[in-house]
Swiss-Prot record:
Lineage, uppermost ranks: Eukaryota, Viridiplantae, Streptophyta, Embryophyta, Tracheophyta
The species this protein was found in: Oryza sativa subsp. japonica
Residues binding ATP: 17, 169-171, 237-240, 248, 254-255, 271, 275, 279
InterPro entries in the cross-refs: ADOMET_SYNTHASE_CS, S-AdoMet_synt_C, S-AdoMet_synt_central, S-AdoMet_synt_N, S-AdoMet_synthetase, S-AdoMet_synthetase_sfam
Gene name linked to the record: SAM2
Domain of life: Eukaryota
Keywords: ATP-binding, Cobalt, Cytoplasm, Magnesium, Metal-binding, Nucleotide-binding, One-carbon metabolism, Potassium, Transferase
GO MF term set: ATP binding; metal ion binding; methionine adenosyltransferase activity
NCBIfam families to which the protein is assigned, alphabetical: metK
Official protein name in the record: S-adenosylmethionine synthase 2
């Protein structure tokens, strides 16, 4: 009898999607603040609609930041250069409403900068998750990896002119058929590929489908996962000319599953973009990913999830949880002990160990195409940490 398989789907959106535009603006602001003042406290939100981008939130920094320039440069870099593609970076209205961080929060979290790193408290309460699986070289879920890479490839062929008819906005979705191998996930085949991409007026649906198959799907999805039964939905709505902020409103922090594991694992609900590393929504999720990835990379489990939780103003985590989904080579309680001994979950120490105070052109890179599974030295939380522990004598 054939083994039971199941279908699992993950989606992604391009850098030109309105919500992702907002994530990138928020992280561009964070980068600019950290580049001049590594101790900047940043909680920057962005929203957008037709012909308008607004940045708002709480920022305490010694940096001199030209918010309007950051907004326009970010929009232009994505490709929003005229109204007909969804936004004109040079002519749109830019609104700024930034205040300082509440002094109540400041004294509770970092004692107005008087605390040592190990004493710095969490910027808020919350719980975060990290996940890893041995089904791909990135130790990420295949459905998420493929959906994300299709979106990145759409942008690549738009910007290099291979598919000149493409416009910045777009969405992808991949359904993978999986086998459950005693708790580990084994991809069998790609069941369905869905791409909806913004395009100009001149291109036909047949041209869109042919170009997407040849220049986007073929280079991204390995042949071994495609067969004659694979279903393709390529711009199934038939027309997608109006896009970007003209088509939909956008807001920071509305694509948190795309940012993480594509629906696998779990999510504590906190978004990442526009937040400095004292915000454990971000730093806690990053260290939890490094812990889960290191467990899988070390061979202690084929699949692993790590949860960590915090109270505002308290440095030590309230709880740390590990589940290997039955794939552990040793009991989960022993894996948990190894995680606690090898990773420092205090916010001030996570910031140092992952070098999270460094801005520049760093966090904006995380704000499109996922925060995890990326090969880039700036993604320090993706570095597998060699685990020190007592190996049981056989």
């Amino acid at each position: 009898m054939a083994a039971e398989t199941f279908l699992f789907t993950s989606e992604s959106v391009n850098e030109g999607h309105p919500d992702k535009l907002c994530d990138q603006v928020s992280d561009a602001v964070l980068d600019a603040c950290l580049a001049q003042d590594p101790d900047s406290k940043v909680a920057c939100e962005t929203c957008t609609k037709t012909n308008m981008v607004m940045v708002f939130g709480e920022i305490t920094t010694k940096a001199t930041v030209d918010y309007e320039k950051i907004v326009r440069d970010t929009c232009r870099g994505i490709g929003f250069v005229s109204d007909d593609v969804g936004l004109d970076a040079d002519r749109c209205k830019v609104l700024v409403n930034i205040e300082q961080q509440s002094p109540d929060i400041a004294q509770g979290v970092h004692g107005h900068f008087t605390k040592r790193p190990e004493e710095i408290g969490a910027g808020d309460q919350g719980h975060m998750f990290g996940y890893a699986t041995d089904e791909t070289p990135e130790l990420m879920p295949l459905s998420h990896v493929l959906a994300t890479k299709l979106g990145a490839r759409l942008t690549e062929v738009r910007k290099n002119g291979t598919c000149a008819w493409l416009r910045p906005d777009g969405k992808t979705q991949v359904t993978v058929e999986y086998l459950n191998d005693a708790g580990a996930m084994v991809p069998v085949r790609v069941h369905t590929v869905l791409i909806s991409t913004q395009h100009d007026e001149t291109v036909t649906n047949d041209e869109i489908a042919a170009d997407l198959k040849e220049h986007v799907i073929k280079p991204v999805i390995p042949d071994k996962y495609l067969d004659e039964k694979t279903i393709f939905h390529l711009n199934p709505s038939g027309r997608f000319v109006i896009g970007g902020p003209h088509g939909d409103a956008g807001l920071t922090g509305r694509k948190i599953i795309i940012d993480t594991y594509g629906g696998w694992g779990a999510h504590g609900g906190g978004a990442f973009s526009g937040k400095d590393p004292t915000k454990v929504d971000r730093s806690g999720a990053y260290i939890a990913r490094q812990a889960a990835k290191s467990i899988v990379a070390s061979g202690l489990a084929r699949r692993c999830i790590v949860q960590v939780s915090y109270a505002i103003g308290v440095p030590e985590p309230l709880s740390v949880f590990v589940d290997s989904y039955g794939t552990g080579k040793i009991p989960d309680k022993e894996i948990l002990k190894i995680v606690k001994e090898n990773f420092d979950f205090r916010p001030g120490m996570m910031t140092i160990n992952l070098d999270l105070k460094r801005g520049g052109n760093r966090f904006i890179k995380t704000a499109a195409y996922g925060h995890f599974g990326r090969e880039d030295p700036d993604f320090t939380w993706e570095v597998v940490k060699p685990l020190k522990y007592e190996k049981a004598s056989s």
